[in-house]
C-alpha cells in the first residue's frame, strides 16, 4: 500500500528519504496519512525541520504539488546533496 523512510541528518533535522503510495491508492487519503505519520515520527524524535529531494521532471509534478500543499517550500541542497538540475529540494519547519 504505502511506505516511507526518514534519515537523521543532525540532531534537529531529518530527511524524508522516500515516500511511496501504491498506484491503487493514489488520489485517496493514503499519501496524506503516510506524510502525517512521517511528520509525527520526526517530531517525536526531536526534529525541528524535515527536508526532501524529489525530481524536477513532469512525472514528479504531482509529488511537488502535494508537498507544497503540505507546507514544504523550496530550499538549497542539504546533507550530502549537491545542486542538480534534476533535483528539487524542499523543507518544512516542524
Sequence positions of predicted segments:
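Acetyl-CoA-dependent GNAT
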Residues: 1-13, 17, 22, 35-37, ...
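Conserved acetyl-CoA-binding loop-helix of GNAT-fold acetyltransferases
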Residues: 21, 27-44, 65-69
Amino acid at each position: 500500500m504505502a511506505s516511507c523512510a526518514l534519515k537523521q541528518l543532525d540532531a534537529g533535522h531529518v530527511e524524508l528519504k522516500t515516500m511511496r503510495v501504491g498506484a491503487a491508492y493514489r488520489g485517496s487519503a493514503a499519501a496524506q496519512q503516510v506524510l502525517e505519520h512521517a511528520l509525527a515520527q520526526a517530531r517525536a524524535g526531536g526534529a525541528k525541520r524535515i527536508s526532501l529531494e524529489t525530481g524536477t521532471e513532469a512525472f514528479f509534478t504531482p509529488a511537488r504539488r502535494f508537498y507544497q500543499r503540505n507546507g514544504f517550500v523550496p530550499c538549497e541542497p542539504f546533507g550530502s546533496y549537491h545542486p542538480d538540475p534534476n533535483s528539487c529540494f524542499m523543507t518544512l519547519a516542524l
